[in-house]
């Protein structure tokens, strides 16, 4: 039941091809007043925070625990490889099932994967398994998020509206990278940021109830 797909209707104010082209300010006003769009953008902020924190700081986390830089490099390579599989699969599933509910599953699985990774003893097996799982979940949010934007407003202004959503992703990316480094400089570990990534997974699940 969690994956039954609803149908979205594009608002005529945006999609009507017979209307004159809207400017950026007008599109921004329409988006600002569309609450599900705001929730979607906030959810994408979570994605940016998590992937940049892991992409930048996971190799350092492994080095702190006695693993070689090669292990961190292989981790990133596996993430990149399985990201291809995950992104393609997410796009395929998004054509068949509810995109917001799929995003809820993705953020929830990210949180569970992080909890499992932190709970299990660190070994090359757990590191590479985590890399594969996170690779599948890495940017699988992108086709689903863009698909929701298209369902909300139609495709006429998809590039502009997706760019607005992606801006929040980049805000999250900044804080994922910056806070990770700041926290490590102050405390010598990433414990607070790990807790934040888990909490943000819960937030990511909750906000997509309203999309």
Feature locations, PLM:
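C-terminal membrane-cytosol helix-exit motif in multi-pass small-molecule transporters
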Residues: 1-16, 207-211
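Juxtamembrane intracellular "pre-TM" segments in multi-pass secondary transporters
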Residues: 11-39
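Extracytoplasmic gate region of multi-pass secondary transporters
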Residues: 32-92, 176
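Interfacial helix-cap and linker-helix signal at transmembrane-aqueous boundaries
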Residues: 62-63, 93-94, 179-188
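C-terminal transmembrane helical hairpin of 12-TM major facilitator-type secondary transporters
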Residues: 79-83, 89-148
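Paired intracellular helix-loop junctions of major facilitator superfamily
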Residues: 149-158, 188
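A membrane-interface helix-boundary motif in multi-pass transporters
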Residues: 182-200
């Amino acid at each position: 039941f969690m994956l039954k797909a609803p149908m979205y209707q594009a608002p005529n104010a945006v999609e009507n091809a017979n209307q004159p082209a809207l400017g950026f300010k007008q599109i921004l006003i329409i988006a600002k007043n569309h609450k599900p769009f705001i929730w979607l953008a906030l959810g994408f902020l979570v994605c940016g925070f998590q992937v940049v924190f892991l992409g930048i700081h996971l190799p350092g986390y492994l080095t702190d625990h006695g693993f070689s830089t090669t292990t961190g490099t292989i981790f990133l390579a596996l993430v990149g490889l399985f990201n291809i599989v995950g992104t393609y699969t997410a796009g395929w599933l998004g054509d068949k099932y509810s995109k917001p509910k799929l995003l809820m599953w993705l953020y929830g699985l990210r949180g569970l994967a992080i909890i499992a990774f932190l709970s299990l003893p660190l070994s090359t097996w757990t590191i590479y398994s985590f890399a594969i799982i996170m690779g599948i979940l890495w940017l699988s949010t992108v086709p689903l998020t863009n698909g929701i934007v298209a369902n909300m407003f139609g495709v006429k202004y998809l590039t502009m509206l997706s760019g607005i959503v992606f801006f929040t992703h980049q805000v999250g990316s900044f804080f994922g990278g910056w806070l990770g480094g700041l926290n490590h400089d102050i405390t010598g570990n990433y414990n607070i940021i790990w807790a934040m990534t888990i909490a943000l997974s819960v937030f990511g699940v909750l906000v997509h109830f309203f999309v």
